[in-house]
Amino acid sequence: MQFPESWLRTFVDPQLTTDELSHALTMAGLEVESLRPAAPPTEKIVVGRVLEVVKHPDADKLNVCQVDAGTGATLQIVCGAPNVAPGIKVPVALVGAKLPPAEEGGAPFAIKLSKLRGVESQGMLCSARELKLSEDHSGLMILPEGTPVGQDIREALNLDDTVFEIKLTPNKADCLSVFGIARETAAITGAPLAAPDIRPVLAELTETLPVKISAPDLCGRFSGRVIRGVNARAKTPHWMVERLERAGQRSVSALVDISNYVMFELGRPSHVFDLDKIHGGIDVRWGKRGESLKLLNGNTIELDETVGVISDGAQVESLAGIMGGDSTAVTLDTTNIYLEAAFWWPDSIRGRARKYNFSTDAAHRFERGVDYSTTVEHVERITQLILDICGGQAGPVDDQIVNLPQRAPVSMRASRANRIIGVEIGEDEIAQIFTRLGLAFERDGDVFRVTPPPHRFDIEIEEDLIEEVARIYGFEKIPARPPVAKSEMRATDETRRSVHAIRHALAARDYAETVNFSFVDAEWERDFAGNDNPVRLLNPIASQLSVMRTTLFGSLVGVLRHNLNRRAERVRVFEAGRVFVADPSVKAGELAVEGYAQPKRIGALAYGPVVEEQWGTATRQVDYFDVKGDLEALLAPVPARFVKAEHPALHPGRSARIEVDGHAVGWIGELHPRLMQKYELPHAPVMFEIDTDALVARALPAPSEVSKFPPVRRDIAVVVDQKVEVQALFDEMKKALADDACKFVQRVALFDEFRAKSNTSGGLSAHEKSLAFRVTLQDAAGTLQDETVDQAIQTLVDRMARVYGARLRG
């Protein structure tokens, strides 16, 4: 929000300097980003009147002018501007004057007594561009007729004015106008507020335009009036152009300038239609698929049922609350207009402009909420200015109210406000603060029931009112005290470890932590989760961040691509974050949203060489078993099962479902070749994703005696059908450990696999495979005898033979 200080002080004029006012606004939550002068420094530039103009004797494009600059003597100045003429008043740079430098950082341009083609020139007549007031260099800057000759140009044009630029938070829509800032300034400083002088215009016509509001959920109130006989070619007054330019808005034409001026003044966007281009009445409705509209910016957009429009009997005329259409735009030939000011529901405007990749001042205001009680007053204000500047005759205001917000009172407890703010603020002082803010309230003990005014869409809950009390009371008045808390020794739950410890464990295994958005591209959800119906955002910050993620895989691959594009050769990253899944069984709670599960997961990705390139080890790409080892180390001492299964994002033959205590807790595997090709990856990364709960839970450490006796190791090779999974054999051997004969078995590990090849069978048929296991046995009480070991091995083999038809390989 940008505005000149002089405009603000027409509404409220606190006894503060510019810097003090800036500080007061910033400390109340209206952050002043910058203060800059309305014009660069100048010296000895005054108002002059051109008395006479004659052609230069030796140059066709130059004129010799006689100028009265209030110095007591007529000055002769050579000028080449095409619009120089006797009688006009212009800025005159006297000899010795200093103009702003041509380039930023350069030296000021000094005016000297000089000769141009043999004719002496005693100064220079200036354009607005030469004074750095605008980019207009078409000719001299013509000043209003009433400007006193000889007056310093800085005084005449108020060039010592200061332009404020304020960075507003999204909730402060009520401050998107000069009057809104003035209202806040009055509340902050206690200075009196002068409301705009808005008087109803006498209706000289009886004509109204038929208006139908077909979508009350789009438009709650629509006010308008017909004005005939306007002069669209009228010149916008200098004071209005000056205020608009200092607010960052260039002058277009009188009708457009007036509409923009009132928007900056009062915060109400409005629209002026060319009445003669409207076919019949107008209808405020939702758009229809297949309709199109050419906008004022020249773009033609395709409409659908999610955007609001204003249409007539023949065509769509305007994109409701965002931008007018080209077909009914006013021009310099317009004589009859229809003026409109409406209340558009914020939800019906929010995000619609971004949908078409542009933004407007109107959409910026309406999507945040604009006062719904003042549409008629603002129509009167615009009408007043149009009749004063462009002339014409106005009809009556047609005000249609169909659906306005019902603002329920918001309660605030003074005791809670004091507890949150941290200082004792008396109830009478709180009442005074609410009064200064224009918040109507009722008191019941220490409870204030505040009815939010129509211009405050940000007041909905108790904390909103506490914020208002704090910022008007003054954050600077709140003493800075260090927090005091009693130290308390809490018992440590040894059955759980923190997510912080897990992150440290991953970092110790050479993974770097990354943090990504929880909202992702819808295409990622299809690719990495097989999800065609993700949780969609109503108001995404970008089109490629439109859905909530249900897996971390997409985010990790995105980080991988980002690093590969920067020539990284080895990438190992992890993320601890939430995913969002639609689940009707979830009930609303303090940390839960009804209908949506938000489990926390940990995902990791490894890509490139297992270790950094070195002379002592051959380079090898990371594989499934490397990452599986990292995951097992992370889960230890909890054992995990890895069950062959398919996942949309993973290689069908190199992926597994992770199970702990019989429950599926995650996935591990190599990226699917289809996705590797789609995302242009030279090698397939290996990834895992696991529920955080499975990692934080752990059994209490159980001490066991270290055996003094040597372990016994036996290798066995069993032949099974190729369809039998290794994990299934491990599961059966684990069950066998419950047998008394296997009580000394400490560990079983697979160390070899053999399958028949074309040139050698190894005694196996084509559908068989040989698996070699190393069984480690140990007794803490004594050395194991061969009979005990043989019995344990035979029990394991018998178990596999009975269930899967396994046989010892000869």
UniProtKB/Swiss-Prot annotation:
It comes from Burkholderia pseudomallei (strain 1710b). One of its GO terms (cellular component) is phenylalanine-tRNA ligase complex. It catalyses: tRNA(Phe) + L-phenylalanine + ATP = L-phenylalanyl-tRNA(Phe) + AMP + diphosphate + H(+). Binds 2 magnesium ions per tetramer. It is an enzyme of class 6 (ligase). It is found in: Cytoplasm. Residues 39-154 form the tRNA-binding domain. GO terms for biological process: phenylalanyl-tRNA aminoacylation. SUPFAM superfamilies: Anticodon-binding domain of PheRS, Class II aaRS and biotin synthetases, Nucleic acid-binding proteins, PheT/TilS domain, Putative DNA-binding domain. Belongs to the phenylalanyl-tRNA synthetase beta subunit family. Type 1 subfamily. Residues 405-480 form the B5 domain. This is Phenylalanine--tRNA ligase beta subunit. Its cofactor is Mg(2+). Mg(2+) binds at residues 458, 464, 467-468. Its EC number is 6.1.1.20. Its main location: cytoplasm. InterPro entries: aa-tRNA-synth_II/BPL/LPL, B3/B4_tRNA-bd, DNA-bd_dom_put_sf, Fdx_antiC-bd, Fdx_antiC-bd_sf, NA-bd_OB-fold, Phe-tRNA-ligase_IIc_bsu, Phe-tRNA-ligase_IIc_bsu_bact. Gene3D superfamilies: 3.30.56.10, Bira Bifunctional Protein, Domain 2, Ferrodoxin-fold anticodon-binding domain, Nucleic acid-binding proteins, Phenylalanyl-trna Synthetase, Chain B, domain 3. Residues 707-809 form the FDX-ACB domain. Disulfide bonds: none annotated. NCBIfam families: pheT_bact, YtpR. GO terms for molecular function: ATP binding; magnesium ion binding; phenylalanine-tRNA ligase activity; tRNA binding.
